[in-house]
Swiss-Prot record:
Any one GO molecular-function label of the UniProt entry: ATP binding
Descriptive protein name: ATP synthase subunit alpha 2
InterPro entries tied to this protein: ATP_synth_asu-like_sf (IPR023366), ATP_synth_asu_C (IPR000793), ATP_synth_asu_C_sf (IPR038376), ATP_synth_F1_a_nt-bd_dom (IPR033732), ATP_synth_F1_asu (IPR005294), ATPase_a/bsu_AS (IPR020003), ATPase_F1/V1/A1_a/bsu_N_sf (IPR036121), ATPase_F1/V1/A1_a/bsu_nucl-bd (IPR000194)
Keyword set, alphabetical order: ATP synthesis, ATP-binding, Cell inner membrane, Cell membrane, CF(1), Hydrogen ion transport, Ion transport, Membrane, Nucleotide-binding, Plasmid, Translocase, Transport
Function of the molecule: Produces ATP from ADP in the presence of a proton gradient across the membrane. The alpha chain is a regulatory subunit.
E.C. number(s) listed in UniProt: 7.1.2.2
Amino acid sequence: MSGDPGLEALKARVAEVPLGPEIEETGRIATLADGLVEVEGLPGARLGEVVRFAGGAEGLVLTLDPETVQVALLDPGAALGSGTEVRRTGQLLSVPVGQGLLGRVVDPLGRPLDGLPAILPEARLEIERPAPGIVDRDMVAEPVETGLLVVDALFAVGRGQRELIIGERATGKTSLAVDAIVNQAASDIVCFYVAIGQRTTAVRRVIETVREKGAFARTVFVVAPATASPGLRWIAPFAATSMAEWVRDRGGHALIVYDDLTKHAAVHRELALLARQPPGREAYPGDIFYLHARLLERSAKLSAVNGGGSLTALPIAEIEAGNLSAYIPTNLISIADGQIVTSAALFAANQRPAVDIGLSVSRVGGKAQRGALKAVAGRVRLDYAQYLEMKMFSRFGGFGDAALRARLARGERIGALLAQPRTTPLSTPVQVALLAALAEGALDDVPLEDLTRLKAALGPVLAADASLGPFCAAPDRLEPETRAALLACVRRAREAP
């Protein structure tokens, strides 16, 4: 009997059963206000631990005091009051991850908001995870193609980059990010859209837009609207990042949009003030920079040894009266690898996307830009900036010099090329063809109103040219014969009815 494998396995399982007394730590609610609970009697509680209230509601331990702990409610509808019993779970907050999240709308805890069955997770990950170390990362060298000419040509975004989208209210910030998501419908990038404190109607419009454009099945929506508890809004970006890291850590590629971190900073301030933490500049607590730094540092391009996956972040921030030097905007600008600034003046002038060329920058994306696009986009930004300056001075009097008039006309065409309606992405070959034609002067005699039609007609013309098949599949180099073929396609597109 002693050699029976089944008996030995049973003995091993019995040995694992704890035979001592089970110790359970319990406490009671001392005070309750605005989604934050002060609990007495949990001396062993840890930061980030989940506690459970009588009745099943859960909360997240945010701060530890000598006699009490501050707990953020994760179930705002729970019926709680002073004296309600609270128990430790001993577990840090985690969220479900896996392929089952694709095409779903969930809250930050992974609970469905779309009326469909519960998510069947492949694993669970803690919401607070360390960022990849220096040796675990690789250089940003592959592009995230947004389909927006102004971004891909002038401020390229690379896989693993953090590119901030910042501007005043209602200047097209979310539209830029949604366009980037829509353009991944046929790519290998999985998208995550995180709504933090947004209006439910605005989130619904985003979801419907992504659905209509065919990218819904490759997108995960993590929604903590303005009506959600402060605790849920606070954990939303961290929870969604863990969901996206599951894709990255398996060698995949993910794109995450945080909409927006200004509202996240506001809810962090709200919880800190309720917890009686000392206020600092603009009443934010002292750890506000660390809050967003530890979040955005989790976006990275991993080395080949670690699978070669990537997580690209497009955080969104809102400013007031064009003030980029406010506290939260300067924090985010210093953390990110560049920023795309939207302008209220350009938006009012009907320029879409309303990107401010002079204030926007991509610090590392240039290394990831397609070689062919880099070859034709070199002078576009400088020429357009000079045009904007000359345009301002031209209001005071006409330019008699023919060369200056030609530069003004060229600038107008650059502006018309960069203008792009929502959810109408341009492929990289089309972008290269347009900019090559611009550089060669092939668009100088094209009326501005015809450029929109030309951009729409050029894609099918390129696809029909068999000689451009290899280039369209991998537009990494622009050979002289390829440039000539692209210019010929532009001429045919101009002549198309």
